[in-house]
A protein has these predicted regions:
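Alpha-helical transmembrane segments of polytopic membrane transporters and translocases
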Residues: 18, 29-46, 75-79, 178-179, ...
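Hydrophobic alpha-helical transmembrane segments
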Residues: 33, 109, 113, 143-199
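Interhelical loop/hinge segments that connect adjacent transmembrane helices in multipass membrane
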Residues: 184-232, 275, 283-287
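Alpha-helical transmembrane segments of multi-pass membrane proteins
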Residues: 89, 93, 97-100, 104-128, ...
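Helix-loop junctions and terminal segments of transmembrane helices
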Residues: 46-63, 133-134, 197, 254, ...
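Signature of the first transmembrane helix
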Residues: 1-58, 88-95, 118, 153, ...
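Helix-terminus/linker motif at the lipid-water interface of multi-pass membrane proteins
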Residues: 13-27, 99-102, 160, 229-260, ...
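Interfacial transmembrane-helix starts/ends
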Residues: 32, 53, 57, 66-82, ...
């Protein structure tokens, strides 16, 4: 599973570099703003149904109450589907403002509307992902990620070879987003009858935990997600709003490089959180402390090693032309991207710390 996820993340990292070289700094910034704008509208209205499913379905399964688990999944799917429709409606209303004030180009409004279709394709993806995590189908998740990465890679490489523009790249990412959205839904619908029994969707809502408790959890996670959107996940949008897509392109480049740092740790996030939930539900505190200590040591060691390498050799490796043993001159990013380097060093501080204690992020 980890190998699938690692390959998928590696492909995504390479695609980011290829896309940056194809579009240039400003075009790369516009791409980041459009994708970020749509994603953040969705996050603002998201109740993080995946976390709710992992918590309450996981508890019900641990207590051998499959009917209650089915009621949780059913309710989560309904709520998430409704909020996805609302999110797309809000996006339609906000798209002209986003194009005018953030991208600073009204002609990009159709691009926002186009990529916004991904919100509809992810109508119950969070719920489905939570189901796959609770039922330990990590291989299915990893395989979906790999397929999505390969399809997106093929489309972007085609765009690069044919010298296509921003629209072709955006469509490539949209197709990938639809795969990553619909894939978990299809797989979870396959496994749910086998785990919860046929007719699981008929489980009455009366089996749900206390409505106030569920609503409180959903609202608190939505509030937490909203804070993250404003303070952490909207950096490219803020840069575009206060400066221009050019500066947003520099910032997005720095973020893309940072993603290389956290790439090997990403698989730990989706696999560790369900284990934490199970240990907490069972009160196995010694195992929980041991698990957190182990994953923190692994994440911290990797982060420190990569950070030192970037500080010492980042400018030479990333933004300078260098000649490997095959005799061809290779340059990862053109020199026009060099202003992203100081941003990268600043981001290393915060992301390095967050990367070390990554297990605390979804809680």
């Amino acid at each position: 599973n980890s190998s699938y996820l690692f390959v998928s993340n590696a492909i995504s990292a390479v695609l980011s570099i290829v896309t940056a070289n194809l579009l240039g700094v400003a075009g790369f910034g516009v791409l980041g703003i459009v994708i970020g704008f749509c994603s953040n509208v969705n996050r603002l209205l998201s109740f993080r149904m995946g976390d709710l499913v992992v918590k309450y379905m996981g508890e019900a399964m641990a207590q051998e109450q499959p009917r209650r688990a089915a009621a949780v999944v059913k309710a989560a799917m309904l709520v998430e589907s409704v909020t996805s429709l609302i999110a797309y409606g809000v996006l339609v209303l906000l798209a002209p403002l986003g194009a005018l004030y953030i991208v600073k180009d009204p002609t990009t409004e159709p691009l926002i509307m186009l990529y916004g279709l991904s919100l509809l394709a992810n109508f119950s993806t969070e719920t489905a992902t939570g189901v796959l995590q609770v039922t330990n189908h990590y291989r299915s998740q990893a395989l979906i990620n790999l397929i999505q990465s390969l399809v997106t890679a093929g489309l972007i490489i085609w765009a690069y070879v044919t010298h296509a523009g921003l629209l072709a790249v955006l469509v490539a990412y949209l197709v990938g987003k639809m795969i990553i959205g619909l894939g978990p839904i299809a797989v979870s619908l396959y496994w749910l009858p086998r785990v919860l029994g046929r007719g699981w969707w008929k489980a009455p809502f009366s089996l749900l935990p206390a409505r106030r408790e569920l609503a409180g959890f959903a609202i608190s996670t939505n509030f937490s997600g909203t804070i993250n959107v404003i303070a952490r996940d909207s950096e490219v949008l803020w840069v575009g709003y206060f400066f221009s897509p050019l500066e947003a392109g520099y910032y997005k480049t720095a973020l893309a490089i940072i993603n290389l740092v956290i790439m090997p740790i990403t698989p730990f996030i989706s696999t560790t959180y369900p284990e934490i939930t199970r240990y907490v539900a069972r009160g196995v505190w010694t195992r929980l402390r041991r698990l957190l200590g182990q994953v923190t040591a692994i994440a911290g060691s990797w982060t420190i090693l990569v950070a030192i390498g970037l500080l010492l050799f980042g400018d030479v490796i990333l933004f300078s032309a260098w000649q490997p043993i095959f005799g061809r001159v290779i340059q990862i990013y053109p020199e026009e991207f060099l202003p992203a380097l100081p941003i990268l060093f600043i981001l290393l501080i915060g992301f390095g710390t967050a990367n070390t204690i990554f297990w605390n992020r979804p809680l």
